[in-house]
Amino acid sequence: MIISKINFPEYTGTRCLMMPYIQGDSSSVPEEYQKYSNILDSLYFKKGDIGYLTIDESAVKAGTPHRGARAKHSRALHTEAGKIPEGLYAWGGGTWGSNVNVLLDKDVEIFLANNLEGSCAVWNACHEDTTLDGDIGHLAHVYPYENARFLKAGEVARVGIFTPHESIPVKEDINRQFIRIVSSGVHGREPYFTKNPILTFLH
């Protein structure tokens, strides 16, 4: 589950969401993300494949999880993918009858890391019977903290789209840095995904 450890660059408020890039090639991301070049060059599933990069450097208030308002229950426990009625695996998922813009292959994998000790819990499990949007906070009793691995600062977890993980409320106001790399196997895009001006053929 834990495959390596990274050093985060200086905090500047950098953000991008599911931006396509070429795995293992930092030259495929715009200049504003180059401070992550060492991480992007060394952390990949298959070098040369398309991957999807999320960087979220943002202020988090004490007592709240990084996932924030997206969590529907007292614990921000979730899977990366949602499962829609057609039996397909979706990003986001939404509500019954809503449009699904992004589908995921079942074998999609994700790297997760952040700069704050103990702010992310991961369970060595596969919860395929997930919800439309991946929020499984109502099943928190199935995933007690004593069975979780709490990531240390900079630790990189390699997880699947159905690996239960949770954003833990922070103890003090802090600038948190989070990085997620999603492997190839993502089909479609949401309007709020960050476009990559270097890889215009993907938009």
What are the residue ranges of the model-derived segments?
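N-terminal auxiliary "cap/dimerization" subdomain that precedes the catalytic jelly-roll/cupin core
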Residues: 1-51
